[in-house]
């Protein structure tokens, strides 16, 4: 009898714990999940230039101009660099490349190497930029330069991509989208020249990773 009574008590304690602790655990988990979502995403707008931004944000012309100019400077620092104009044009299309400033992120030995081959090095024009609120709730804006290819053979053709090759959809300014906060973080400076087709390979790899991540997320949500 004592043994049976003991078993009943143990069963009662287990049942009580399951009833009373599980909802608390679930609630705590939900709070952390919501907090994680709030910290991981940012809403940004995509513009081609400062005029597009000003038209969409009356009264914010100064902020739009500042963000655009900062994006241009960031593009000079982080855009893929090519030793020759031909390599850049093969990747981004005719009329989409420019000579990069001498100190645009390149290490001295790489500058010398590029300049020996073509007199300078080349980079794609900034096709647009993302603009969002500063991390931490600051009053200013964060920006990220975007690039796009006019060469149909390139994986970046008709798309907005950042300096790392991540794809943000069709190269259509005026859109608003949600991106991870890491998307607006400064990218590392370009310190070496890219071989012909190298940036396109990066875009293709990033697109594959994005599709894989999206598929994993969908399967997880669906059980």
Curated annotation (Swiss-Prot):
InterPro entries reported for this sequence: Biofilm_formation_YgiB
Positions of region (Disordered): 178-223
Any single Pfam family the record assigns to this protein: DUF1190
Compositional bias (Low complexity): 178-195
Biased composition annotated in UniProt, kind: Polar residues: 204-223
Disulfide bond annotation, renumbered to this chain: none
Family assignment from sequence similarity: Belongs to the UPF0441 family.
Protein name: UPF0441 protein YgiB
Gene: ygiB
């Amino acid at each position: 009898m004592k043994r049976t009574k003991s078993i009943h008590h143990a069963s009662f304690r287990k049942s009580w714990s399951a009833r009373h602790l599980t909802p608390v655990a679930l609630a705590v988990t939900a709070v952390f999940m919501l907090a994680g979502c709030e910290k991981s995403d940012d809403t940004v707008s995509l513009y081609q230039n400062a005029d597009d931004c000003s038209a969409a944000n009356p009264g914010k012309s100064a902020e739009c101009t500042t963000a655009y100019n900062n994006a241009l400077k960031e593009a000079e620092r982080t855009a893929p660099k090519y030793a020759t104009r031909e390599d850049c044009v093969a990747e981004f299309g005719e009329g989409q490349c420019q000579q990069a400033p001498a100190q645009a992120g390149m290490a001295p030995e790489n500058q010398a190497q590029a300049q020996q081959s073509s007199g300078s090095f080349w980079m794609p024009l900034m096709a647009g930029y993302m603009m969002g609120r500063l991390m931490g709730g600051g009053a200013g804006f964060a920006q990220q330069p975007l690039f796009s290819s006019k060469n149909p053979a390139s994986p970046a053709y008709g798309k907005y991509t950042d300096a790392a090759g991540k794809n943000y959809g069709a190269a259509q300014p005026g859109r608003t989208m949600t991106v991870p906060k890491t998307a607006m973080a400064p990218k590392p400076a370009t310190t070496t020249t890219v071989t012909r087709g190298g940036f396109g390979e990066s875009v293709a790899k990033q697109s594959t990773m994005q599709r894989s991540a999206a598929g994993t997320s969908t399967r997880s949500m669906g059980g």
